Swiss-Prot record:
Keyword Lyase: yes
Gene name of the record: ppcA
EC primary class: lyase
GO biological process terms on file: carbon fixation; oxaloacetate metabolic process; tricarboxylic acid cycle
Catalytic activity entry: oxaloacetate + phosphate = phosphoenolpyruvate + hydrogencarbonate
Protein name: Phosphoenolpyruvate carboxylase
NCBIfam families with a match to the protein in the record: PEPCase_arch
GO molecular function per UniProt: magnesium ion binding; phosphoenolpyruvate carboxylase activity
Recorded family membership: Belongs to the PEPCase type 2 family.
Organism: Saccharolobus islandicus (strain M.14.25 / Kamchatka #1) (Sulfolobus islandicus)
């Protein structure tokens, strides 16, 4: 049996600080190849996700890794000891990138030939897994698996002319199959994930399956509590399915450093391991790696790699029904407020520092992402924008919990263990001065501000959260938030950008 990675380094552009080895503030090109090597060698991460979604991708990454760092990769076999996993564009959603999907798939046999030359015959398959983002049905991942088998691996049997086959020209094509990891990002698909996985299992018959649960984008689209509870429902469903099919499922969770995006940081990783029992692989995003002291980062990654994997909490039907109800109530409260703040979020997001060379995709669940009826920036910029205007998104929609009775509240608390801790971490950065300033700058309605105030009041009076400045960092962040809004109002954008960067350094994450 192969090693199942515990940690997966990603290229999420959420870092405030720029790593010393980067040639510029925007990490791209050769720097991303170097970053992949450093993730393995310096940080001890088991797996690197190589992202072809929403950006120009270098499909020669394996060639560059093996030729630039031969000593390391002779000792650590790519595909056996450490892993490289492609994140594809979803051809059904991202129409402009359909051919990038094809190009990335076509590059997999090239990596096989390179590894054969480097390691010897039959030693390893360096790239054998792909991640399909925005998966909503089993048909999508079945199609990806079959596309590779039929359109890539089997093309070596095509006859060109007069008995001459493709393989006579370019050699045989390996591997013959790939493993597809669905990345599930929307609420309904997370809560019905068993249908996606079971349908794939019945057709493809894999020996095991890795399933990627998003935590960041569902928070942006439906609110933090909806995202957490949807992941809990998904983990329960996956473990039930694993038992009923007698088939191993290894969940991955996509988590960032701030509470809204998952709260996995070198300072909070133990709480996240406790929160998401049953998860095998945790994403190590850029803020985790570059916004904290290196020794602390390396130690945290080592601890995650060596931590025990506890079983997921299996939900009874009545518990699951309560959690589903909460996600609907919460989203109904959260989305209209976000729609009202969309202009503010979009205006601020374009001023945040850029950390990756990413192309912008437009449209529902593309990039930009959408919540309800409005287009929004990517999740990192979304979160960074709301923190910067002094309204952490963790607080938005929270008063919807007032609709729960005592039994429902108990079920909620049992299934979101670190709820109060996550909320308190975010609430330190709340700025009371924001209301007047955002009303003035973006003409935010009294109704929207009244709703946010209800959420704030509920967090304080019912949950017992302390809002605003409780230490030097939070006080400084609040001051910077007011200065940012004032400079933005006066259109002194160079100063606005400076304050945004300073706040990101305090949070140890752009968003």
């Amino acid at each position: 049996m192969r090693i199942i990675p515990r940690t997966m380094s990603t290229q999420h552009p959420d870092n405030a600080k720029v790593p010393e080895w980067a040639k510029s503030e925007v990490i791209e090109g050769e720097d991303e190849v170097k970053e992949a090597f450093l993730a393995y060698s310096m940080y001890g991460v088991h797996e690197v996700m190589w992202d072809a979604e929403g950006k120009d991708v270098d499909t020669h990454v394996v060639r560059k890794l093996l030729s630039n760092y031969p000593d390391y990769f002779r000792e650590h076999i790519l595909g056996k000891d450490v892993f490289l996993t492609y994140r594809l564009p979803n051809p059904k959603v991202e129409g402009a990138d359909r051919k990038v999907f094809a190009e990335t798939m076509e590059s997999i046999p090239i990596t096989y030939d390179l590894a054969e030359k480097f390691y010897g015959n039959g030693i390893t398959v360096p790239v054998f897994e792909v991640i399909l983002p925005m998966t909503t049905s089993n048909l999508e991942i079945i199609s990806v698996a079959r596309y590779y088998e039929k359109a890539v691996a089997n093309e070596d049997e095509l006859e060109l002319y007069n008995g001459v086959k493709v393989k006579d020209l370019v050699g045989e094509i390996y591997p013959k199959v790939i493993e597809v990891i669905p990345l599930v990002e929307d609420r309904d698909s997370l809560q019905n994930i068993d249908n996606i996985v079971e349908g794939y299992y019945k057709v493809i018959k894999p020996k095991y399956m890795r399933v990627f649960l998003a935590r960041s984008d569902p928070a942006m689209n439906y609110g933090m509590i909806t995202a957490v509870l949807s992941v809990k429902i998904a983990l329960s469903e996956l473990y039930k399915l694993s038992e009923s099919l007698n088939f191993e499922i290894y969940p991955i969770i996509g988590v960032g450093s701030l509470p809204f995006r998952g709260h996995l940081s070198p300072e909070n990783y133990e709480k996240v391991l406790e929160e998401y029992k049953g998860v095998y692989t945790y994403t190590i995003q850029s803020a985790f790696k570059y916004d904290y002291d290196y020794d602390k980062v390396k130690s945290a990654i080592s601890s995650i790699n060596n931590s025990r994997i506890g079983p997921a909490k299996i939900l009874e039907k009545y518990e699951e029904d309560v959690l589903r109800k909460i996600t609907i109530l919460y989203t109904e409260r959260y989305q209209p407020i976000i729609e009202s703040l969309a202009n503010a979020i979009n205006d601020v997001s374009v001023l945040l520092p850029r950390r990756r060379a990413r192309k912008l995709h437009i449209g529902l669940f593309g990039y930009s992402r959408s919540a309800g009826k409005v287009s929004l920036p990517r999740a990192i910029s979304f979160v960074g924008s709301l923190y910067s205007i002094g309204i952490p998104p963790e607080l938005i929609g929270i008063s919807s919990l007032s609709n729960l009775d005592e039994k429902e509240w108990d079920i909620f608390k049992q299934n979101y263990v670190n709820f109060k801790h996550d909320l308190q971490t975010a609430a330190r950065f709340f700025n009371w001065e924001s209301f007047e300033l955002i009303k003035d700058i973006w003409k935010i309605s009294e109704d929207t501000i009244a709703k946010i105030k209800e959420d704030i009041d509920y967090a304080e009076s019912v949950i017992g959260i302390k809002l605003g400045d409780i230490d030097y960092d939070s006080r400084k962040h609040i001051l910077m938030s007011s200065l940012f809004l004032l400079s933005f109002k006066e259109k002194i954008l160079q100063e606005s950008k400076k304050y945004l960067y300073e706040m990101a350094l305090i949070r140890r994450s752009l968003g």
